[in-house]
Swiss-Prot record:
Heterotetramer of one alpha, one beta, one delta and one gamma chain. One of its GO terms (biological process) is organic acid metabolic process. It is an enzyme of class 1 (oxidoreductase). Disulfide bonds: none annotated. Its EC number is 1.2.7.7. It catalyses: 3-methyl-2-oxobutanoate + 2 oxidized [2Fe-2S]-[ferredoxin] + CoA = 2-methylpropanoyl-CoA + 2 reduced [2Fe-2S]-[ferredoxin] + CO2 + H(+). InterPro entries: PorB-like, THDP-binding, TPP_enzyme_TPP-bd. One of its GO terms (molecular function) is 3-methyl-2-oxobutanoate dehydrogenase (ferredoxin) activity. The keyword Oxidoreductase applies. It comes from the Archaea. This is Ketoisovalerate oxidoreductase subunit VorB. Gene3D superfamilies: 3.40.50.970. It comes from Pyrococcus furiosus (strain ATCC 43587 / DSM 3638 / JCM 8422 / Vc1).
């Protein structure tokens, strides 16, 4: 169906689709929506590298695929290495990489394949300065293998190897600040994004496309299956993660920080509003919630100071 021109003028999200219906994601999957936005932003002239993760399955079983772009499946820990090699090979053959008329080399990996098992390859990619974009879709656990904790799993969360109940083995470590590790490499561009704010996400994808050198985006992508949440609440949960400052939106560009919160002067909502929609937090005690709230507000104040000093 043709989209009316008056609607096109009001919407900044591209209308073209390169991620099609019929894929095998769970209902309410945040990762599949995020991947759809990536392909809307970059189009068919994209080489997408996906390691072992949910998105490998979502893309479709051979010989079918829901993705209308070049797709390279690779081993769990190798995303950073593979996008480095593809970018180097394209340049050696004389192709333009990055830019609006260049080939986009994109790594698309989960938090387990990035923050944990793939951290070494990610660091090498960043340090060498390759012209590619690495996107970590953050659903805060190893969802494809059975909802095991990752270093991106938040304090107080239930997973299959941090179970709740009477023995109370919930996750007792705070979420790893992967974006800080990335920024420590002094790359030109890094950002956080959320599926609840698609225009902000696509703007950041477009900026990463234009900037020479490596770019990194950490995308908050709820998993209703692993988070024990209603499938129709993924966007609301993602929005509350931002509104509570649990997952603030910001950019780091050439040494400068910029906060992208929808209402930057508004005080964050209580963390309980984010937690109560998810069954993975149902075992948290009052003290657990207070501990997480304290950490969230401390990290939020730290980010505001960084933006103030290095903005």
């Amino acid at each position: 169906m043709e989209v009316p021109e008056n609607i096109k003028k009001r919407v900044t999200i591209p209308f073209e689709e390169h991620f099609y219906a019929g894929h095998t994601a769970c209902q309410g999957c945040g990762a599949s929506l995020g991947l759809r936005y990536v392909l809307k932003a970059y189009g068919k002239k994209t080489i997408l590298v996906i390691p072992a993760c949910c998105s490998t399955i979502i893309a479709g079983p051979w010989p079918y695929s829901a993705i209308d772009a070049n797709l390279f499946h690779t081993a769990f820990e190798t995303t950073g290495a593979v996008i480095s090699g593809i970018e180097a090979a394209l340049k050696a053959m004389g192709y333009k990489v990055k830019g609006e008329d260049g080939i986009m080399v994109v790594g698309w990996a989960g938090d387990g394949g990035t923050a944990d098992i793939g951290l070494q390859a990610l660091s090498g990619f960043l340090e060498r300065g390759h012209d590619a974009v690495y996107i970590m879709y953050d659903n805060e656990a190893y969802m494809n293998t059975g909802i095991q904790r990752s270093s991106s799993t938040p304090y107080g969360a239930w997973t299959t190897n941090t179970p709740g109940g009477r023995r109370h083995f919930l996750e007792k470590r705070h979420k790893k600040k992967v974006i800080d590790i990335v920024i420590a490499h002094r790359i030109p561009y890094a950002a956080t994004a959320s599926i609840a704010y698609p225009e902000d996400f696509i703007r950041k994808l477009k900026k990463a496309q234009k900037i020479s050198g490596p770019s990194f985006i950490q995308l908050f992508a709820p998993c209703p299956t692993g988070w024990r949440a209603p499938t129709d609440k993924s966007i609301e949960i993602a929005r509350l993660a931002v509104q509570t400052a649990y997952f603030p939106l910001f950019e780091y560009e050439n040494g400068k920080y910029k906060i992208n919160m929808p209402n930057p002067k508004k005080e964050p909502k209580p963390i309980e509003e984010f937690l109560k929609l998810q069954g993975r937090f149902k075992y948290m005690t009052k003290e657990d919630i207070e501990t997480l709230q304290k950490w969230v507000l401390e990290e939020w104040e730290r980010l505001k100071k960084l933006a103030e000093v290095f903005g």
